[in-house]
Amino acid sequence: STAVVTDGQMEPAFDLDAELHFQPTTWPGARLPHTWIFRESNGDKVSTLDLCGHGQFTLFTGIGGEAWREAATQVGADFGMAINVHVIGPRQEYVDHVGDWARANEVSDTGCILVRPDHHVAWRADELSEDPKSELARVMNTILAR
């Protein structure tokens, strides 16, 4: 499917029967794993799944991925759509106190994960690209078949 752009890595091997068990991964094409994170402002527990969907693409990044936020804003404007962005890390809107997101996301703090409105991972980057806006625009062009 062109609605998924792989990152060049092989699909992870399943430890258990994939037909019977869910194995959390952010490999493109997989459903975004659920992890609990916490809203920095009030400590409320929030699922990563509740932060995406709602008819929009969502981009998750870490404390070193601020350039992805800027790229998503610019690319979203170019495409005439909003791309929601959530930075998860210390002193950000959402924090990962127990480390569940850090264990599940499979990218560095400068990388990102782009999630489709149906909660499936469309693409991920392990680290910050030299030109995040161009990279994200290329990915969105592929996903949206433009």
Predicted features by range, described:
Residues 1-146:
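Helical substrate-recognition/capping region of FAD-dependent monooxygenase/halogenase enzymes
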